[in-house]
Amino acid sequence: MKKVSRNLLQARQMVDKNRFYSLEEAMELVKKTSYTKFSGSVDLAIRLNLDTRKADQQLRGAVVLPHGTGKSVRVLVATDSSEVAAKSLEAGADLIYSTAELEQNLKIDNFNFDVIVVEPKLMPILGRYGKKLGPKGLMPNPKTGTVSPNPEKAVAEIKKGKANYRADRYGIIHSLIGKTNMEVPQLVENANTLLRLIKRLKPNTVKGNYFKNLTVSASMGPSIKIRFDNL
């Protein structure tokens, strides 16, 4: 613990907590201040002027990042169609389960996957396992593209590097935008892709400043403030 605390202290000393950095400067710092021996995740935290109690201000979805997330994702497609199964495997699916196999595995808590992709007609079956899948973030959702009439397309997008985003009850979106071993321009482009989408999705009922705060951090590193006056 002492070593981790010392590393974190040294990392924090590299960051001026009163300064708002440009996106490029922030991505350079997030790489320098990550003190893990492995490539850590880079997460963007976007605080928005939202009241998520209102239905039209609940932002949730997914975006394909131009340089991917850097994270390997194990994708399961549940289908009883041999054609869908073949296309999904070709698109990069790691597992194919029939509906019977899916239920068998869910009953014994065999969660050997990171994402489930299904066709809309299978959602009533998955709904029975909501208490198991929901807390693990595994329940498919149309907004994130994991409930789709074209599972193979969903698989291809996930494998390409799809990042989910969701505003919490405080109006803050936390999203993975890459790994610390990625180049600064790649992280910047990924961040801009997400930020442009969030800006475009601004609800019409939001008054005043939409963006309230913007920070980036590595999984093991300090939080770095980013300028957002130009968003």
Curated annotation (Swiss-Prot):
Know the name of this protein?
Large ribosomal subunit protein uL1
Regarding protein family, the annotation reads: Belongs to the universal ribosomal protein uL1 family.
What's an example of a GO molecular-function annotation for this chain? rRNA binding
The encoding gene:
rplA
Q: Which Pfam families match?
A: Ribosomal_L1
Superkingdom, taxonomy of origin? Bacteria
What is this protein's function per UniProt? Binds directly to 23S rRNA. The L1 stalk is quite mobile in the ribosome, and is involved in E site tRNA release.
Any one Gene Ontology BP term? translation
- Organism, per UniProt? Mesomycoplasma hyopneumoniae (strain 7448)
